[in-house]
């Protein structure tokens, strides 16, 4: 089975690097699924999105992302996010409280975190 090299990087840390069978991300143009052999592309990520990675040797990985870019080349997929956190690391109660924040950045971040938690719970 063909696979694709993927890197998920935020401003603060490298979240993941490895081989995957598919990557999905939410861009300003809509959700995109990337399989091996995808045409090169550069896309802007939404401010409250979710990235899903299906590693070739493990369970589905889901991260909340805020802003950034998705870069697809013949060699790899690179997701450069302004902010990213694994769904497993999200404090749901804290994220829900941030939904009421006046700060739009905090609100968007909380929305992304809660979306990631829901997506992770899906089959």
Swiss-Prot record:
- Where in the cell? Cell membrane
Q: Which UniProt keywords apply?
A: ATP synthesis, Cell membrane, CF(1), Hydrogen ion transport, Ion transport, Membrane, Transport
| Signal peptide range | none
Q: Which SUPFAM superfamilies match?
A: Epsilon subunit of F1F0-ATP synthase N-terminal domain
Name the Pfam families on file.
Answer: ATP-synt_DE_N
How this chain assembles, per its entry, is:
F-type ATPases have 2 components, CF(1) - the catalytic core - and CF(0) - the membrane proton channel. CF(1) has five subunits: alpha(3), beta(3), gamma(1), delta(1), epsilon(1). CF(0) has three main subunits: a, b and c.
Q: What is this protein called?
A: ATP synthase epsilon chain
Q: What gene name is listed for this protein?
A: atpC
